[in-house]
Amino acid sequence: MSGSYPFIDIAALDSVREGFARGDAQLVLAHDLSTVLWVNGPGAKLFGYNRVEDLIEGQLDLPVATRRQIAAFSSENTSAPSAVAVRLGGGLRSELTHLHVSNIKLPDGVAALLVATQMPDNSAEAAISGLGDDSTHIALVDAVGKVVAASPRFALLDISASTLEDLIVEAGDATDRIVKRRIRTGSHSVPGAIARLTDTPALHLLCIVGDAPAQFQTAAEAVPLPDNAEAVLEEILPEQGDAPAQQAQKTHAEQPRPKTFAFDHDAPPARFIWKVGPDGTFSEISPDLAAVVGPNSADIVGRRFSDVANVFGFYTDGSIAALLLERDTWSGKRLLWPVEGTRLRVPVELAALPVYSRDREFLGFRGFGIVRPAEAEADPEEIGLALAGGIPQNRKPRKEPAETARMVGEDDVLALSEEVANDDQPAAVLPKPPLDITPTPGRRDSDKVISLLNSCAQEKVAADQAKFLKEKERATRPEGGLTKTERNAFREIAERLRKQGLANTRAESETPVSETSSIEPVEPTPPVKTRSEPIQPDETALLANLPVPVIIHSGDAIHYVNQALLDITGYESLDDIRSAGGVDVLFNSESDDGETRQSMVLRHADGSEEPVDAHLNAIAWRGGRALMLSLMPVTAADLPAPAELPAANDEEKQALEAHVEELKTILDTATDGVVLIDPEGRIRSMNHSASALFGYERDEAEGKFFSMLFAIESQRAAMDYLHGLSGNGVLSVLNDGREVIGREAKGGFIPLFMTIGKLPHTRGFCAVLRDITQWKRTEEELTNARKEAERASNQKTEFLARISHEIRTPLNAIIGFSELMADEKFGPIGNDRYRDYLRDINRSGNYVLALVNDLLDISKIEAGALDMQFEAVSLNDAIGEAIALMQPQANRERVIIRSSFQSNLPDIVADSRSIKQVALNLLSNAVRFTAPGGQVIVSTSYELNGDVVMRVRDTGIGMSKSEVEQALKPFRQINALEGRKAESAKDWRNEGTGLGLPLTKAMVEANRAQFAIDSNPGQGTVVEIVFPPTRVLAD
């Protein structure tokens, strides 16, 4: 697919990817409305094209009306999609289509237009229709790596399920939702990319670039032919009109030949990567393993771990197979891997960790291994020789998909290749001069090809024979039993001995290897000598003649010492050293004061000591592994000069001692206990306060473990605190102390707060312990007081709830019968006074019922048990309902209620029932305490700082500051009569229970709002309720 932008980059855009996954028709246009920058398959089909390539980077000829409608939207600076109804097609086949047009930003920031519409077919196959060709392959993959839909040639890529799972995980972790890298197809890799289109359910778009048949051609490294190979081939295969012969010549020249594997003993350890699936099948292994053990030995991809283990004889206890089933991290597992073409096997150490998908689905193990060729040992089963069998007889050469004719002389070439590959021993042949081929009538061209390959094979065998002779000569050298590293070590030691005069100068002469002009027939190749075979007597003689002390040991067991070590230590034999204590008696790494020495010290038989330098090497010994320790005496010139300490006079010493005593006195005076601890966790000393705190004498506690000072439940916490400070972790920086329980000598317990610090020079610790008994007692008292207050509040609430229930039942009966009698439904009462009495009974009953309800509400609010349901509440609507309820009462009192509500007032988060109750209480008080002809004004506003404010203003009698404070207290009324109203006026303040304002204020605060009241005698009252921005649902 061509285009200025990669197809997958635009498909992964946030404004495109979900519609692409749904199968919508999508088209990205430049602002000229003619150039198509990107289109998917349904989009190309919508505009009459079968393939995406036919439209991308092309010119789209839209109708004039459609272009005008889209241009009108493109001028708007908005990213929201706009619906446009256009007619697509022409003549009688035009259809009205609803398009959604939106402004988008391309990956490079260029603005463009996205035109999209839903299609009737929203299947996965429709989403990728029109995509993919011989060089481009498209697929939709779900969350578990299953291919939902794909282009026709996608299956030829042979991408494994594990590779798809890895791509899905990488795409989920990518910030831009796209991963571009080379993707493994079969045994090779090709460029590709994957994009995560949707999350729920997860769907991914996978794009592969490359010709599918070409991806299956083996790109092996070709074996170079001699310089005159082209000339020889031209003589063998002259230009003819026979097309099959020419094709065979070309195929033979291009066919790669595998390299011969040769095991390298002295190669360093190699690290390789491996991966197995959930069923234990190898899905990937890096070529580093094949470079050490051979390609056939490392060819395990597609095979189960248990099968490979059974064939190669890795293990017998099945421990690794059990670890693969546990799905946990493991490491340090050692096995022996056979080496191709040899009788050896090399140790391999494996480690692995489990791999999970984003949905916590187990995907298998990823791990690494370390193969150590230098530690190869003999394989009794000789599996490596079976792995070097060459090309099997029944194996057919793979044909390329485009080839139909068989190569000329192919059977003969394969037969010769098998003969050379299966030849385990070098043949006694001499190199021949370049082959001189003359045309021979009746001779097949394939015979000529065989002769050429035979010449090359003979030269290769001769080279292998020369290499074998060179190895044999090297095996006869005096130091042949030692590795290159060990020989270099001995030469370095000898050089140092010559410089110090401890050894005579010896000339090291090596007989040069003469080159033979001809190669004689040789005996069959002897078995390769492994490094695990025992050291030969000539090597022991070499060690015995060295003037350097040498010890060969394994752990504490000494296998061999030379005469130089016996001479320098004074022991008679190796048995004397073993009976004296072995390796431990020979070396002393600590000085008399317990400090670690900077150099190793060799202890003699008479107890004297001598500093030495040591050099350690791993060697093969008696069929196993051992360590060879070579020692070099350190002369006085090599030792560091002791530091000269300034002599302290008596006055400085006395001043220092006085300072120490002063510090001890200060510690003993402190009220906190101070305990010094050594690095092993034992008590070094403690001050008087600590001794009195725990009841131990100083000498009684010294030398005992620090944990003895704590109760059993606090010992673990105290020691964890101490161990955490011993390192350089977080505790050593963020040292905030611990609360622990101390244990007295007599068995009592003390609450303590402990802080531990590190001592700089002695590597010990200092613990400061403070008695927090009084703090704990005060904390317990406060906790009990709070619980008691909560219990009393709950009892009051429960009492009021019961009283309310008991009072409501008879009150409802009294109110109901009074209303029934006042209506005279069963006959006339006959007296107006009785009717007045009935009205009084009804009014008093309602008053008592309201009082009980207010008591219950205020008790619930104080206890925090009021059931409130916070939701979006329209404050204007709530106040409007309250005004409607109070309007009849205001009319009777001849009080005017006026309202001023702000339009577009945002909703608030509050309890709808309590907000209406607050509005009713405020309006009721305002109407009640306002004289006839007065006004009550209710208003709402939306402040600039985001507050929503409700105000209730009246022109009533007002209150002073002291009266306001008294009115806000429960069950308090303003009883003082002042002369600021006419004597004939009604004393409204003697009505009510004194719960109106306190209950209103409590409900306002329960709704997370602020309540304020401002009143002046004779001027009226203003009540203001403010809802903060956190309780306002602003747009």
Swiss-Prot record:
Coiled coil: none annotated. SMART domains: HATPase_c (SM00387), HisKA (SM00388), PAS (SM00091). One of its GO terms (biological process) is cell division. Residues 1-613 are annotated as: Important for polar localization. The lineage of its organism: Bacteria, Pseudomonadati, Pseudomonadota, Alphaproteobacteria, Hyphomicrobiales. Keywords: ATP-binding, Cell cycle, Cell division, Cytoplasm, Kinase, Nucleotide-binding, Phosphoprotein, Transferase. Signal peptide: none annotated. Residues 500-533 are annotated as: Disordered. GO terms for cellular component: cytoplasm; plasma membrane. Its EC number is 2.7.13.3. GO terms for molecular function: ATP binding; histidine phosphotransfer kinase activity; phosphorelay sensor kinase activity. It is an enzyme of class 2 (transferase). Residues 802-1031 form the Histidine kinase domain. It catalyses: ATP + protein L-histidine = ADP + protein N-phospho-L-histidine. Residues 659-730 form the PAS domain. It is found in: Cytoplasm. InterPro entries: HATPase_C_sf, His_kinase_dom, HisK_dim/P_dom, HisK_dim/P_sf, PAS, PAS-like_dom_sf, PAS_fold, PdhS_histid_kinase. This is Cell-division control histidine kinase PdhS. The modification Phosphohistidine is found at H805.
